[in-house]
Regions:
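Non-catalytic cap/lid and distal C-terminal segments of serine-dependent acyl enzymes
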Residues: 19-290
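Sec-dependent N-terminal signal peptides
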Residues: 4-13
Length: 290
């Protein structure tokens, strides 16, 4: 925790002078036949050099701007030396919905978005150069996508994540994606993170997840931790006072980014310099100065 606080200190001390750029981009999804907006935060050190990428997913009712509204991502990207990508996930839970062909966000986050980013930014285009995390619905989505696409992501996290959806069958429009739990119990079982994690083996993914004691998702996160312990799967599980809110998530993100930074340092190829990586397809560049 002390090191996380140091990251916060140095990041926000540099916020006024942060040179990271934020691009707003439109990414074409072939599977959904539409464009999906996203924010791309490129640290100053990323100009002309390949860098790892953190995909950062929002929660239910949020959008691609949620994380930037919670905390300024530019100094964090600069301090941790990684590109940060925040896609819009609507209220999809980041599944490929078996009921709604217009909601195929697992394919988007796992395949279409990384391919688009790799083609336009100077990334490290392999699982060793990609991590994914998110808050609430996005925490579920990050673990869901990473568990099912370990060839695409080497590290994953969740903060206040809905890692077991089954205790909440009437909440957050999940019925629109999966149908009623009582009519589709096997579908709900198959679409929850804690069940997906049951086959995970130690070393297949670097994992970090956290939850506040006062969060309604605390128990399901504790259950996931205990399951992984029984399976012998190494992971970082952090708990501390806090509820399901922006104050908790803004404090959690630096800790998770430190975890990913360390993992990238051990696993990603050295970031070599290349020609300038101009971002094609950018339709609006934002200046998020505060």
């Amino acid at each position: 925790m002390r090191k996380c606080l140091l990251i916060l200190f140095f990041a926000f001390a540099a916020a006024g002078a942060s040179a990271a750029q934020i691009d707003t981009v439109a990414v074409c999804s072939t599977k959904m036949q539409r464009e999906i907006p996203a924010l791309v935060v490129v640290p100053d050190a990323g100009v002309g050099r390949r860098m790892p990428v953190l995909y950062l997913l929002h929660g239910f009712g949020g959008s691609y701007t949620t994380w930037q509204n919670i905390t300024d991502l530019r100094p964090l990207a600069d301090a941790c030396g990684m590109i940060v990508v925040c896609p819009d996930g609507a209220n999809s839970w980041y599944w490929d919905s078996p009921l709604d062909p217009a909601s195929q966000f697992e394919t988007f986050v796992a395949q279409e978005l990384p391919d688009w980013i790799d083609a336009r930014y100077l990334t490290i285009p392999s699982r060793e150069g990609r991590a994914v995390t998110g808050l609430s619905m996005g925490g579920h989505g990050a673990l869901w996508v990473a568990l099912r696409h370990k060839d695409r992501f080497g590290a994953a996290g969740s903060t206040s994540g809905g890692v077991d959806i089954r205790p909440f069958p009437d909440s957050w429009e999940m019925k629109k994606q999966l149908g009623e739990l009582k009519d589709n119990p096997e579908r709900w079982n198959a679409h929850t993170v804690i069940r997906q994690a049951a086959s995970l083996r130690d070393g297949e993914l670097a994992l970090i997840f956290d939850c506040g004691y006062q969060d309604f998702f605390y128990q399901v996160n504790l259950n996931l931790h205990e399951q992984l312990m029984r399976q012998g799967v190494g992971h970082d599980f952090l708990v501390r006072p806090g509820a399901h809110n922006a104050a908790y998530w803004s404090a959690s993100l630096p800790c998770q980014m430190l975890f990913f930074q360390r993992w990238f340092a051990r696993n990603a190829p050295p970031a070599g310099r290349d020609g300038l990586g101009a971002a094609c397809g950018v339709y609006r560049r934002l200046d998020h100065r505060r």
